């Protein structure tokens, strides 16, 4: 399957769970025929229970619902939580679950990291937000900053077709009428052009990265990238510096208060290379950054699940939406500029690691390890990931007046 640019879409930016969850739950409540939901993490907390209730109500009124969770990201849902959904008819699957070894999860690599919802063939959501309370702004200092989009329009058919082709037990019909054409700058704000792109471990290994590289090559005035886990390869780093050196304002927002300390260490290894190449680097200090968004000039933007690190670019299953629309671009720019002004600290010379022989050695070793990490993982014993469907709980055998006790055989008096 290969998608082309689709015109005439309405796309709404959603910030954090505060905006994302109500929009998703409302769309599920309006579903008439089919719901498909994929996510990396679903916790059995307040947010997870609200999603559970919305899916349960939809299934009880006859809507066909399918849920795909990652076997590493969502390993601890209770049997009762899942069983109530499957009993109502929800098809519930885990992507490549594996038993723990000495209490540790071993299925770390090649994860299903997409976050997608499709409602009938009318509405879709794509982004980086999981289903857990930590995506709500009132969660506290560890609340995550993140983004998703709500989409209506022709591109929803592409997202649905992608899901149908990647779920088992379905036979998608070919859409011979689908148009493929080059995107042009949208002259009608609000009528967005959109392209659905994804990363897999087969024919689309570098599709998302290629669109980032193309964007950096074509940028004329401005690029803003906000990415939670930033440690890309040489090509993307070189493209960022090259754009900055030809006069493009290149701004990078990374985690200043990361949820994993190694993230900060990894990103700071790149500060010398980027800052001295003209890239403006900002550390987001308000709380952990979990977003994966970018914009270019006044019309290009992307929102999705893909980080710019070895796991997302070389191993995980990811999905992004690329958008050509001046109105959406301006909305995202206003949001990111507000973050830069109010919640970020720009990396200056005083924050750069000192260029000692020890720091240089650490940087070189760490950079090359992370750069070659996907190839090293590739040498591990390969297997075909599988989707494990959770069966409905077994129904207890019903006692009836006509049942015969095997120890007291005979006819009913």
From Swiss-Prot:
Its EC number is 2.7.8.-. It comes from the Bacteria. It catalyses: 2 a 1,2-diacyl-sn-glycero-3-phospho-(1'-sn-glycerol) = a cardiolipin + glycerol. PROSITE patterns: PLD (PS50035). It is found in: Cell membrane. The active site is at residues 113, 115, 120, 290, 292, 297. GO terms for molecular function: cardiolipin synthase activity. Keywords: Cell membrane, Lipid biosynthesis, Lipid metabolism, Membrane, Phospholipid biosynthesis, Phospholipid metabolism, Repeat, Transferase. It is a peripheral membrane protein. Residues 108-135, 285-312 form the PLD phosphodiesterase domain. One of its GO terms (biological process) is cardiolipin biosynthetic process. HAMAP family: Cardiolipin_synth_ClsB. Belongs to the phospholipase D family. Cardiolipin synthase subfamily. ClsB sub-subfamily. Catalyzes the phosphatidyl group transfer from one phosphatidylglycerol molecule to another to form cardiolipin (CL) (diphosphatidylglycerol) and glycerol. This is Cardiolipin synthase B.
